[in-house]
């Protein structure tokens, strides 16, 4: 796990698994953690890393309901987690989904945990909407397409956009159960003006990108979606995202959307 300051009031922590990111944002004496790393050792170390940096969170957020973004409670079991209304609906309609998926991933990676995942106290957040942090407000924007639920979190006073599983420099657009190309395109359209206002864009997997690179990624993802809708079996994948794993994801996309 590595931690990088992208702003005096923002730290991005990156897991060794899939370059999964967690972002701590601060306003005055208050901080909030968005998403989570994966490995138990990373989650155990996370409270110390954030406390020593002055980012001890008072609450958690998750950009969407995929299991790898819901693990903050394992690091901070006493904190509530804020979820978009769509994510809350997904959790109610698919009880135990995140826990089952986590157990399967742990088995695949030979990972043992001292306790199971429990979401505990949750807060359903209207999206689009706002969420107070200190004297500022986080903006919550709809971000469906990768999954049927999701939100992007924009901190305008930091010029920071945390967009969930979009605009990744290591992963092509992918679609989990309930995702759709149409909604994915709509999310990219909503993200575009936010990227224009941002200094830094943090994807759910990969490295934080400056505005110019994030706009390039957005254009690349739109081009990829064009090929996907045409049914291209061997499309030209974007720079830095053309490898065996991403080719496999493309085949999965064709199957999921076919």
Language-model segments: which ranges?
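Active-site environment of divalent metal-dependent phosphoester hydrolases
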Residues: 39-41, 65-71, 88-91, 148-150, ...
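Accessory terminal helices/loops
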Residues: 192-200, 207-258
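Short loop segments at secondary-structure junctions
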Residues: 28-30, 79, 86, 156-158, ...
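Active-site HxH/HxHxD metal-binding segment of metal-dependent hydrolases
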Residues: 43-44, 48-126, 130, 226-228
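Active-site neighborhood of phospho(di)ester-bond hydrolases with catalytic His/Asp-centered motifs
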Residues: 34-37, 58-68, 82-85, 142-145, ...
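Conserved N-terminal glycine/acidic-rich loop preference
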Residues: 23, 33-36, 43, 57, ...
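Catalytic core of the metallo-beta-lactamase
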Residues: 1-53, 57, 116-186, 190
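A structural micro-motif
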Residues: 55, 79, 136, 198-199
